[in-house]
């Protein structure tokens, strides 16, 4: 086997963004969900190891014979990292050649998680949402919010998306940032006064919050 085949790529968030779009990821998620339903992939339950410092190590493997590939995401949950301005859920994704067992790539798992999770919502919007949509609504502006918003914009040609978060300053800052970052989609991103204002007349709604209580009433 030549050296090129046994080498390992290290792919950052910027590397991944340069080669795959949200629309690409939505289609990839659709394919992955179908493979799970068809039983053509092996996805064991994740392994969790609890550590010190209220931390936990999560290992999530999968094997797709028809793709000759296996993968494992390692995501570590350390809630106190925020006290040191560190990510609370750092992650890496390992891609393995199914023919040789060689690790062929290591990807920024945090971004892969954001992208894949957002695309899951995008797939639902694409398959289940109305074909003609003009207004979107999103509640929450946390780590998953940017990808969820882009998935909504990629799935439907929206004119406007309202954003709400309990932290008014963060909501405004997020809306301004997303207006610039997602300008290619042509939608106006607006901070909402409250959750009711956010969802009023919305064609698509997504919540990005761990709240155990309802964040709006239908």
Predicted features along the sequence, with ranges:
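N-terminal ligand-binding/catalytic initiation module
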Residues: 1-114, 122, 132
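Short helix-loop-beta connector
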Residues: 128-135, 157
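A structural signal for isolated positions on well-ordered beta-strands in alpha/beta enzyme cores
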Residues: 137, 161-162, 190
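Glycine-rich Rossmann-fold phosphate-binding loop(s) that bind the pyrophosphate
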Residues: 141-142
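N-terminal Rossmann-fold NAD(P) dinucleotide-binding loop
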Residues: 145-146
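Aromatic pocket-lining residues of Rossmann-like dinucleotide-binding sites
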Residues: 152
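NAD(P)-binding Rossmann-fold cofactor-contacting core
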Residues: 155-182
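Rossmann-like adenosine-cofactor binding region
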Residues: 184-218
């Amino acid at each position: 086997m030549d050296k090129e085949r046994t080498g390992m790529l290290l792919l950052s968030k910027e590397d991944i963004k340069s080669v795959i779009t949200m629309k690409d990821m939505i289609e990839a998620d659709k394919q992955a969900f179908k493979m799970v339903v068809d039983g053509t992939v092996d996805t064991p339950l994740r392994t969790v190891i609890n550590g010190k410092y209220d931390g936990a190590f999560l290992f999530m493997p999968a094997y797709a014979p028809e793709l000759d590939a296996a993968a494992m995401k390692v995501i570590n949950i350390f809630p106190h990292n925020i006290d040191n301005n560190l990510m609370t859920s750092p992650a890496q994704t390992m891609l393995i050649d199914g023919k040789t067992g060689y690790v062929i790539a290591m990807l920024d798992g945090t971004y892969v998680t954001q992208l894949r999770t957002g695309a899951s919502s995008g797939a639902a919007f694409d398959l289940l949402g109305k074909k003609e949509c003009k207004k979107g609504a999103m509640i929450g502006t946390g780590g998953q919010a940017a990808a969820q918003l882009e998935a909504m914009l990629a799935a439907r040609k929206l004119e406007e998306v309202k954003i709400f978060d309990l932290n008014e300053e963060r909501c405004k800052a997020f809306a301004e940032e997303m207006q610039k970052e997602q300008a290619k989609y042509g939608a106006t991103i607006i901070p909402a006064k409250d959750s009711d204002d956010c969802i009023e007349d919305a064609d698509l709604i997504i919540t990005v919050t761990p709240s155990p209580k309802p964040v709006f009433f239908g």
